[in-house]
Curated annotation (Swiss-Prot):
The lineage of its organism: Eukaryota, Metazoa, Chordata, Craniata, Vertebrata. It comes from Homo sapiens. WD repeats lie at residues 49-88, 92-133, 139-179, 189-229, 251-290, 718-756, 759-798. This is DDB1- and CUL4-associated factor 6. InterPro entries: DCAF8, WD40/YVTN_repeat-like_dom_sf, WD40_repeat_dom_sf, WD40_rpt. Residues 676-705 form the IQ domain. Highly expressed in skeletal muscle and testis. Expressed to a lesser degree in heart, prostate, and adrenal gland. Pfam families: WD40. The modification Phosphothreonine is found at T654. The gene is DCAF6.
Amino acid sequence: MSRGGSYPHLLWDVRKRSLGLEDPSRLRSRYLGRREFIQRLKLEATLNVHDGCVNTICWNDTGEYILSGSDDTKLVISNPYSRKVLTTIRSGHRANIFSAKFLPCTNDKQIVSCSGDGVIFYTNVEQDAETNRQCQFTCHYGTTYEIMTVPNDPYTFLSCGEDGTVRWFDTRIKTSCTKEDCKDDILINCRRAATSVAICPPIPYYLAVGCSDSSVRIYDRRMLGTRATGNYAGRGTTGMVARFIPSHLNNKSCRVTSLCYSEDGQEILVSYSSDYIYLFDPKDDTARELKTPSAEERREELRQPPVKRLRLRGDWSDTGPRARPESERERDGEQSPNVSLMQRMSDMLSRWFEEASEVAQSNRGRGRSRPRGGTSQSDISTLPTVPSSPDLEVSETAMEVDTPAEQFLQPSTSSTMSAQAHSTSSPTESPHSTPLLSSPDSEQRQSVEASGHHTHHQSDNNNEKLSPKPGTGEPVLSLHYSTEGTTTSTIKLNFTDEWSSIASSSRGIGSHCKSEGQEESFVPQSSVQPPEGDSETKAPEESSEDVTKYQEGVSAENPVENHINITQSDKFTAKPLDSNSGERNDLNLDRSCGVPEESASSEKAKEPETSDQTSTESATNENNTNPEPQFQTEATGPSAHEETSTRDSALQDTDDSDDDPVLIPGARYRAGPGDRRSAVARIQEFFRRRKERKEMEELDTLNIRRPLVKMVYKGHRNSRTMIKEANFWGANFVMSGSDCGHIFIWDRHTAEHLMLLEADNHVVNCLQPHPFDPILASSGIDYDIKIWSPLEESRIFNRKLADEVITRNELMLEETRNTITVPASFMLRMLASLNHIRADRLEGDRSEGSGQENENEDEE
C-alpha cells in the first residue's frame, strides 16, 4: 500500500487485523508511514514535572510511562495519558542530568543516568535515596554525554564522554565505582571526545560512536573488552568496521550531537552541530575510493580562520520562533540596546585576529631560517601589542559550551543546581565540569558565588633577559575559548604582560588552548603522582624531526579546533569573576592554556620559549643540549625530586605503554602546584597525540568501510546546544529539534520537508516517538514535556511559513558559526584593559618624545 493512501485503506487494515488476516505489527508501520498522521499532529498535553530544562526523555518498553531528567537534577517517571507523576527521584546528581534510561527487562524499576560532572548513577526505584546515592560511577573525566542500554540486557549499559572513552559497565560485577583514575571499564578509547553512541537494534553487538573530529565510528563489540574482563585492546582501531565523515567535514572538528539506528539497522542518522543531518548506510564502502586531501591542503584550510562575533552570555535572542537573523533585525530597526557595543567589540576582535593572522603568515615564512637562539628586535616590533590570536581555529562547531572551573565555585544553596564538584578521594581533584542550568530564565533566578583563588607565578630569568624594555610591559587580555559540555561556548579571560604575548607570538603563535571542551587531554593523576622511589629518568626517544612531523601531522589530522588562543601568562591571577547558572560556568581568570597544541601556523617551532610555555617540542627537541626537559628553574629540594619522578612517569608512558592515556580536561588537571604538572601533561599529550596519529595512519591499511552520504536533511538549526536529537519515526520519516523552537519532520527517502511544529520558546532538544502509537514526546529549554498526537481534523502544514523559517535558520546558522558567547564581565575587563593599554601607550609616546629631545640637545 502506498504511503499516500487514504483512510478507508487504513480502516480495512484494522479490519483485517481484527480478523487475524494480517500481522498486527504491520499495521503500525503502515499508519506511521502516512503523511495524514504527520501533518495532523497537534499538542495534546503538557507535562509540567520539572523545575529546569528537560534534557532527556525516554519511553518505557510498553509506552505507558516517560522517564525524564532535567537541570533540576531530578528523575521523574510520569504518565502522559493521565498527566500524573508516578515517581519523583532525587537522583543524587549534582549537575544537570543529560541522559537517563530504563534498564530493559527490569519492570521499569532500575534506571541509569549521567550528568555534566561525569558521574553516572544506578538507581533502583524501590530503594531509598541514601542507598541509591551509594550506587555511583565516577570513572569519567569531564562531561558524560549519553547512556545507552543494550536491548534485552538488564545488567549492562554503556556510556560516552568528554574524556574520549566509551565505557561498558556490568551491574553484576559492581554497582558503584569511585576508584581514582579508573580505567577498568574502558571499552574504546577514541582519543577524541565521544559525544554520542547508538546500538544497532537487530544486531546489538554493533556499536556506533560519534566523535568530536566529525567522525562516526562503528565497532563490533565482540572484538572488544575491558580491563575488568581481561581482554582490553587498548587501540582505537580494534574492532572498528566502518568510519563515516561527510566529505566537507573531513578537515573540521564538528561534533556529533545525535546518533540513531533505523529499526532494521540498515541506516544510521547523524546530526552534526552547526551543520546538518546525514543518513548513511554502514555497509556502504564507496567513499574508500575517494581522494583524501593532502597534508598541505589541510594546512591551507586551517589557515583561513573565520571572523568571530560576540554574543552576550544569557542572550538567547537568536533562539525560539521569534528569532530573526541579524540582517533582518537591522533592516527592521529592531536592534537591541547592546548590539552596537557588541558589534564594536566584535569589530575590534576581528581586527586583532586579522593583524595576528598577518603576523603568523610572516612568522611562518621567517621561522624556517631563524636561529633558535632568540627573536630579533625587528620581529618583535612587527607583533601586535594587543591580544594575538592568529590561530583562531574556532571551528564551525561554535556551540555554547562552557569551560568548567568547578574548583573555583562555591556550592549553591539551591537544590536545582550545585557547582561544587563531586570528589571521592582527594580534596584537590574532582570530576570535571558542572554544566549548570541552561535556560535563560534560570540565569536570573540563580547565581553561583565564585571564590577568588589567587596564584602568582614568578617570571623566568630568561624571560627577563629577553624583555626589550623592562618595566614597559603592557597588560593585555588572554582568551581561552572552549566547547566542552552541552550548552554554550564561553571565553576564559586572563591578563598577561606584553612580552609574554610577544614571546608567544614569536613562536609562530603556536600556543594553543585545547578546544572541544579541552577534550585533548592531560595525563591521569596516577601518572602525575608516582611513588617517590621512582627517580630514574627516561627521555623520550624522539628526535627533532619526529617532533616536527608530529606537529605537521597534528595540524593535518586534528583540524580546526574550537578555541581561541591569545597567550599564556607568567604572571596571572586565577580569579573567577561571576558565574551564572544559565550556561555552565562564567568567566574564569585562569591559566589560558594548559596544553599548547602545535598548529599549521607553527611549522617548525624554532622561536624562543618562555618558562611558562615549555611545550612538548621543547621537551624533546632540546636533547642535544639537555637530555631532560626543563620545567621550573626554581624547583629545588623535595619539590625538585617530586618533579623528576613526575616527569619520569609521563615520559615512560609512550605509545607502547599498557597504560593508555585518556583525555583529561584541564580543569581537572590544574590541581598541581606550579607549572610542573602542566609540563608533564604536555609531554603526556605529545605521546597521546602521536599514538592517535599512528592509529589514523593504520586506518588506511585496515579493511574498514567508508560509507558515502545517502541523504542530507536541512532546514533546522543545531548550534546552541549539544544534546539536540534527530530520530527516525516509522520507516518513512526523519525528525529533529531546532534552535528556532520548532520540530522538523522530513520524508526519509526524499528529504522533503513535511511538517513544522512550534514546540518550545527557545530550543527543542529531545524528540522521542512512542514505541507503538502515533504519539510524539518532545522537550527542550522550556521546563515541561510536550505530547503530540494526530488530533487535527485536517492537514495543517503551512508550506509558506516553513520556507520562511528554513530561510531564517540558514542565515542564522551561518551567523552562529562565527559567534562566541562572552559574559558581561568580559566586556568590562576588556574595556578596562584597553583603557590601560591606551594610557600606557600615551605615556610611552611622551617618554619617547622627551628622550628624543634630550638626544637632540646632547648632539647640539
